[in-house]
């Protein structure tokens, strides 16, 4: 599993799995390096690999409502700013289903 931070800032352009990776944060740089190392290792061992680039993960215990109640919020007020979020249970379902519909070399 990786993260969407590997894409970096695309200045408002639409980002897909096929978009260029140009991370700007240390987390994004580290995750892209890890992706490349895993890919290299799997190629060397002739194994198949799928990469899942996850966005902001939330759960019933960790979400905006919980943070609002606790007073632990960060307000971001930018015009046309969007967030990409995914629930932890959706991640579990996707990973489970990927075992049966494996697509070697795919990035999701």
Label the model's feature ranges.
Residues 1-4, 52-54:
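SDR active-site strand-loop-helix element
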Residues 4-14, 57-61:
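Conserved catalytic-site region of short-chain dehydrogenase/reductase
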Residues 11-51, 76:
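Catalytic helix-loop patch of NAD(P)-dependent Rossmann-fold dehydrogenases
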Residues 12-16, 64-69:
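Short, glycine/charged-enriched secondary-structure capping and boundary segments
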Residues 23-28, 55-57, 78-86:
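Glycine-rich "substrate-gating" loop/helix at the edge of Rossmann-like oxidoreductase active sites
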Residues 47-66:
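Flexible, glycine-rich beta-alpha linker
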Residues 65-73, 80-108:
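Alpha-helical substrate-binding/gating segment
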């Amino acid at each position: 599993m990786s993260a969407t931070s590997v894409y970096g800032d695309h200045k408002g352009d639409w980002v897909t799995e096929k978009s260029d990776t140009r991370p700007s944060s240390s987390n994004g740089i580290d995750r892209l390096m890890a992706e490349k190392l895993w890919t290299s290792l799997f190629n060397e061992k002739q194994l198949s690999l799928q990469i899942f680039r996850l966005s902001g993960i939330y759960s019933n215990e960790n979400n905006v409502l919980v943070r609002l109640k606790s007073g632990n919020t960060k307000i971001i007020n930018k015009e046309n700013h969007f967030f990409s979020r995914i629930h932890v249970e959706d991640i579990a379902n996707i990973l489970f289903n990927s075992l049966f519909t494996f697509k070697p070399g795919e990035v999701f």
